[in-house]
Amino acid sequence: DVYKRQVFDVRQAGIPVIVLIGGSNGCYGGIGIVAKCCDHMIISEEGRLSVSGPEVIEAAKGVEEFDARDRALVWRTMGGKHRYLMGDADLIVPDDVNAFRDAAISLLGASRPLTLEAVMQEHQALQTRMQRFSDCADATQIWQALGVADAKNVPLAEIPEFLEMSAHVR
């Protein structure tokens, strides 16, 4: 809670807080919650974001519900492309320090208002998302519902091709 409070204090001062999620470790648990409290998120395809990590979900719900060893499943549900398509990440970049730097620079000075109205809009968007995709059993079905061209090939696409495939979704 201390980190969330500090993020909110910085945002309230009008300073944009930009989170960068790359590499192979993922952004899970409390720090995943803190990441969503920031103004902007930049993620790579390899970056992952979730309230619970794959192993935690598997331990709580069983391997039948979520197999943490199924890397394709993990990336489809928590990976950068999915988070970008769902609107959780503002930008997706190659997993490269220079790409992250350039993207972060592009967002400097772009703070988002931290108001009750903004929080209520986010809650409504999440409720709408749950209703819209409640019948989807896999991320590829969500991508199809979003209208992503050739959704089954999203995991194989390089970032430029992926951005082309998904341009109309965002």
Q: What kind of region is each of these model predictions?
A:
Residues 105-170:
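Intrinsically disordered, low-complexity segments enriched in small/flexible residues
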Residues 1-116:
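Conserved catalytic cores of soluble enzyme domains
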